[in-house]
Amino acid sequence: MNKSRWQSRRRHGRRSHQQNPWFRLRDSEDRSDSRAAQPAHDSGHGDDESPSTSSGTAGTSSVPELPGFYFDPEKKRYFRLLPGHNNCNPLTKESIRQKEMESKRLRLLQEEDRRKKIARMGFNASSMLRKSQLGFLNVTNYCHLAHELRLSCMERKKVQIRSMDPSALASDRFNLILADTNSDRLFTVNDVKVGGSKYGIINLQSLKTPTLKVFMHENLYFTNRKVNSVCWASLNHLDSHILLCLMGLAETPGCATLLPASLFVNSHPGIDRPGMLCSFRIPGAWSCAWSLNIQANNCFSTGLSRRVLLTNVVTGHRQSFGTNSDVLAQQFALMAPLLFNGCRSGEIFAIDLRCGNQGKGWKATRLFHDSAVTSVRILQDEQYLMASDMAGKIKLWDLRTTKCVRQYEGHVNEYAYLPLHVHEEEGILVAVGQDCYTRIWSLHDARLLRTIPSPYPASKADIPSVAFSSRLGGSRGAPGLLMAVGQDLYCYSYS
């Protein structure tokens, strides 16, 4: 009797020992320590991991998750996550993830500074030349591969910016940059400390190696509200104005403003003449696009909440097209009389500019994403369209069959407005993710060619803005990528 009672008590004690969270924690620590102490030949599977995987992620994936605790892969033990209360609690999953991402970013920056990037094994200039001589590569493929090789060897260099107000350069942060058609000017929007935005134009014609120096022309009168969307506009001549969609502030409604580039001193010497600022009362504009199509000459479009507004700058005539969702992205086709729109609902549709806004005949094409569309780009032959959304999907659509023919993997986006940069001459696609990494894909086979970490720590306020061109600084310029982040401008030029 006493023996059975003793065995029952022993079983009960062992069961309560296992159910107590403190003992579970200690057992997990012991198991973790024992795993860490195993010899190297027992962990051979871990050596096969991809080099892009962070050490923190690899460490936490092999240990069980305990509610209310997190595992530190460096110290190899669990720590308690305190519930929300008045005291400051630095131990959160977000802070842990941020720390892992920062350590990965610093590691990639060190790798970039230490050696040149190689796109893939056996991919070098000598092998490409030999294949071309043997007839295995035609001229087109050889040019594409040569561009890819030079792209993989781009090195980061800081650009020295000069201005009439040097003190502002140290405090104002870049919000976005936008190169003009010839890539000899860069329109900039900078966030100022007191609130609002300041605009400037950087002359890129002086952007030459080895000394990368540029001058920023500013017009301090135009310190204004938050910019929702911006594009170059060709009213008097090519890229004579900048079209801005501004948010409303207090009792001041939102508007679309045509800002003459001539108002920035010496922005385009010899061509620009003093111009007038034109402002159109268009509240709540999410996106804008300028038309170079002869069917909509001197016109621009704005994407609003549940409608598209087409405005003629010269006559002031307007056409309104009703939609079922907010229009977040727009672009005019050049040859076909079409305006493509991307919506918050995930729908992409085209407006036939020859039709009026009466009836439903103006919807020419309809495509669908699973999330809000943030960017649409029409390829030069106007038979394909590139679109990205807030789920991080980038798809290439065939407009003739309305089917997705290619998808570009790796982009990161959850809720931000992030543009796409398509460069068919170089055969590449460039996009900056919400994780602050700039990714470059091959346009032809969707292969990820390069991932560039941000020079600044990743944050929502410091997502880089980029501009890629085959001729940075004008017709005699070299191909390269400009990246604006924080107060700095960087150039990734072909070596």
Curated annotation (Swiss-Prot):
Pathway: Protein modification; protein ubiquitination
A GO term from the CC aspect: Cul4-RING E3 ubiquitin ligase complex
Keyword check for Cytoplasm: no
Alphabetical GO biological process terms: protein ubiquitination
InterPro entries: CUL4-DDB1_E3_ligase_receptor (IPR052254), WD40/YVTN_repeat-like_dom_sf (IPR015943), WD40_repeat_dom_sf (IPR036322), WD40_rpt (IPR001680)
Compositionally biased residues, Basic residues: 1-17
Name the UniProt record assigns to this protein: DDB1- and CUL4-associated factor 4
Lineage summary: Eukaryota, Metazoa, Chordata, Craniata, Vertebrata
The encoding gene: DCAF4
Bias-annotated ranges (Low complexity): 51-62
Basic and acidic residues bias spans: 24-34
Region spans: Disordered: 1-66
